[in-house]
Curated annotation (Swiss-Prot):
One of its GO terms (biological process) is glycosphingolipid biosynthetic process. Its cofactor is Mn(2+). It comes from Rattus norvegicus (Rat). This is Alpha-1,3-galactosyltransferase 2. Mn(2+) binds at residues 198, 200.
Amino acid sequence: MALEGLRAKKRLLWRLFLSAFGLLGLYHYWFKIFRLFEVFIPMGICPMAIMPLLKDNFTGVLRHWARPEVLTCTSWGAPIIWDETFDPHVAEREARRQNLTIGLTVFAVGRYLEKYLEHFLVSAEQYFMVGQNVVYYVFTDRPEAVPHVALGQGRLLRVKPVRREKRWQDVSMARMLTLHEALGGQLGREADYVFCLDVDQYFSGNFGPEVLADLVAQLHAWHFRWPRWMLPYERDKRSAAALSLSEGDFYYHAAVFGGSVAALLKLTAHCATGQQLDREHGIEARWHDESHLNKFFWLSKPTKLLSPEFCWAEEIGWRPEIHHPRLIWAPKEYALVRT
């Protein structure tokens, strides 16, 4: 009798295992199928009535009609920058006329430094704000290991030491507080606009003054066509980053965001405060600082959005609307860099 009961339990466990394995396979199969057909999900169209009213500080009147197949503006009147909708030469001249200095921050902690930093900086020298005044801020736990990269005229690199955290999640979440302190200090005094980027990516095309605005958000390459109910916002109501099913506009990528010093001080303060509140309540948002970033952009709308061309993942595959990727995700070797 006991033996028969044991066999029954084993059969039940095997059935549960096979069912779980089957559901997992179905999920992955469905996800791949969904990826093939998501190109047919409509993005919406910028209303013709507001197109002439959409002007950019650096490129003048934008050519939204040049890209009728994609969404080129938001419901609150912010432009979404796609290839062919702007004149890069106009933007470059305007930035030089204003004699701007653009800051570029990047965190290279632990093995991220040797794996990604040199390629990031070399490609930035080739494509990021070419001909403009640029100051790089590299935050790292090993300042002595930062590679030497030849810099062009009017371009500086500053290395800022940071503490290495025990978990990679803590590195991600400490970023907002570190950026807030830097923006309130030397970085805020010497830069007019600042862009904050992840290090595990590299520039592949011109990333110029056409991206500048008071508050800039990056559409996430994996989610820019998804309906709102599918977007991976924080749903735990206890978290300061939580958004309800009726909230949210787009899903923004924390690998790229930027703006004026004043606007970024508000952004980083909001995110750092939200993370601290979550920590005090023993909560950790699903996507860490990115979850808090999305909450901030829901409450404080960005004044310019960058299309996925400005931060693209090649593993997604070919997409007809992606003409010229400007920034590419490097291969993610988490097993190597997060240990």
